[in-house]
């Protein structure tokens, strides 16, 4: 997402809390992207569910890369003062889930992402492809 789009989007937030959760999602997306994760997507769940404001979904080519992307996301979020509440790995780490309460980050291998298809479950939600 380009900076001008990000600024315009932030102006649409009703509260400072909404702007903060979007910044958290952006931090996670940027970290994943910089670790060469592909197809990074932000899903805006505000008003649809009570357990999170955003999902950040990213793909990695290998299980090793999913772990490295997850480590980078955690480090960047901690730098911003946000620690993960939980970290869940499926068998073989093809899917890593990081729960930062208002933002949940899902890092998949390409095969796992095709199998679980989270974006299609939330097709009614606003979805943005991360681009820098």
Language model features with spans:
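Long, contiguous binding/interaction regions
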Residues: 1-47, 61-68, 75, 80, ...
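Short amphipathic alpha-helical segments
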Residues: 52-54
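Short hydrophobic/aromatic beta-strand micro-patches
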Residues: 57-59
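Active-site beta-strand termini and strand-to-loop segments that position acidic
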Residues: 98-100
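Structural motif
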Residues: 102-104
């Amino acid at each position: 997402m380009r900076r001008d789009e990000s600024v315009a989007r932030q102006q649409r937030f009703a509260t400072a809390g909404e702007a903060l959760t979007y910044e958290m999602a952006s931090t996670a997306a940027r970290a994943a992207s910089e670790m060469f994760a592909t197809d990074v997507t932000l899903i805006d769940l505000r008003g649809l569910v009570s357990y999170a404001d955003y999902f950040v979904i990213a793909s990695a080519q290998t299980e090793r890369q999913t772990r490295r992307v997850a480590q980078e996301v955690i480090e960047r979020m901690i730098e911003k003062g946000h620690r993960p509440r939980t970290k869940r790995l499926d068998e073989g780490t093809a899917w890593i889930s990081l729960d930062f309460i208002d933002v949940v980050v899902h890092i998949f291998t390409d095969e796992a992402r095709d199998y679980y298809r989270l974006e299609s479950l939330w097709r009614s939600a606003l979805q943005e492809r991360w681009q820098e």
